[in-house]
Amino acid sequence: MTLGCLCILVSCCLFGYSQYRQYKEIKNMQTLYEETIPLIPDNYISSQGGYLDLQGHYIEAVLEVGSIHWVIGDEETLPHYKNKNIIIPESLLKQVQSLKNRDILTIHAVSGETIKYQVEVIGKVDQLSKSMPALYCKNGSSYYCINLIKV
C-alpha cells in the first residue's frame, strides 16, 4: 500500500515538473519573440544567412499563426529549419496540434522578408519529406506534420 502511494506521488511530481518545464519553455519563447520583433526591419534588406544573437540564441526569423508566436533559431530547443522544413520541439506539440486547416502562418525573417503560408494539417507521419515545405513536430517515434502552402 505504501509503495503504491509512493509511486503515485512520484508520478504526480514528474507530471507536475514536465508541465512546469513546458510552461517555462513557452514563456522563454514568448520573451525571445517579444525581444526579436522590434529588431526586424520593416523593409526587406538583402542578406543571406543573417541572424540575431539574443540571450545566446541565434534567431533567424519569427513565426506567427493565431495565438502562436515563436522564434526560429538554429538549435534543437527552438523551432529551426531543416532543409525546406521547420522542425518544432516536442514540448510545443500541443500548440502545433491546435493549428487548423487554412490558418495563415507568417514568417518574418530578420532581413525583413515576410513569407505567408496556408496551413494544411496532415497528422502523423513516419518520416520527414523533402518534397514541399512543412512544419514537423516529433511525436513519440513518428512526427506530427503540417504542410505549408505558400500564399
Residue ranges and their predicted role:
Residues 4-151:
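Solvent-exposed, non-transmembrane regions of membrane-associated and secreted proteins
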